[in-house]
Amino acid sequence: MRAVAIIPARYGSSRLQGKPLMEICGRPMLWWVYQQVKKSEKIQEVWVATDSPDIQRMCRERHMLCRMTSADCPTSTQRLWEAAQTISADVYVCVNGDEPLIDPQVVEQVLPQRLEGFFAANLMAPIRSPAEAVDESNIKVVADRQGNALYFSRSPIPHPKGSLDFLYYKHLGVLAYTKEALDFFAHTPKGPLEQVEDVNELRFVEHGKPLRMIPVESRSLSVDTEKDLAHVRRLVEEKLRQGKLVIT
């Protein structure tokens, strides 16, 4: 099974402009994500998909594989689909470009054991605090007994009316798709649920497509604000001092 990771990266961000190129210990944030994913033994190639000439230039300078996509890609999944048109793989793994300390072993967990019957998968992690549950940037998810997604929401789901004894989950920005799944997404218009929640994955759910949810123990450290960036910089500096990270 040939698995290729693609990191969608756009320069414009509603919360942190130019985020992929912001420096962390002398390297762009996107470089750190790329290097972490490259450590995976089950990923054959890692690519960046972007519409930014500045990001493309950085990738060339740092010998990172890069594909240019159109400037009007409405979603990261659409950008992934565009890049996949010229990149051969059995499974395409989408990795968010704003988690510079992402664990490569966690990324591997989204890969299927076999291709037969596989369509798409998404990692999810337990929510550990009420603040996480009510934060609309954390997309909550519930799954059926077979592990397929039932619904995604920016609101806490399910609502704890009958009991408080429930482990809530949030989706992580690591997904795996077959070419069939990406083609379906690219050629299917948004449904009303996706429009109101602004969650890409609902496009599969609304049309009854299987999206396997895989629970992992991971505390994601995504960079969405200047405060997040400062925190990650401190963590990277500490890991460099301890020899847990190496700049090459």
Pin down the residues of each PLM region.
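N-terminal glycine-rich phosphate-binding loop and ensuing alpha1 helix
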Residues: 2-49
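Hydrophobic/aromatic residues located in beta-strands of well-ordered beta-sheets
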Residues: 5, 46-48, 92, 121, ...
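Short, high-confidence coil segments that cap the C-terminus of an alpha-helix
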Residues: 43, 89, 116-119
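Short phosphate-binding loop-to-helix
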Residues: 47, 53-112
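Conserved core of the sugar-phosphate nucleotidyltransferase
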Residues: 102-191
